[in-house]
């Protein structure tokens, strides 16, 4: 079962470079032909581009996930939310990011067993430390089958 003592635990800080080529690749992979995402000079990142943050995290960020003690065989991605406090980042922007375990709660599953919900928030800040965007994801560890 998920380690509930992890609520409030903060992962390492890391940088995420918004690269023009990666913005274009992401836009094409998601079927978008929006010119704002494909602009060669100042491409705007699509709102869900921040999901790529997992590729930028340093190896020690995995410690946060390991310490949660989630059974990966029973893991589901439950929800994803993005909040932009400023305009979406443009190509060339460097975002500073950090993830926190915001909440862990349980619900009885309909097919047996208790499900654990882990809500994690990643804050993306600019060079001045102002929060530009937040990503909130909910992982679900499904109940063990008896």
Which residues make up each language-model segment?
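Hot-dog-fold acyl-thioester-processing enzymes
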Residues: 1-79
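HotDog/MaoC-like acyl-thioester-processing domains
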Residues: 1-2, 84-146
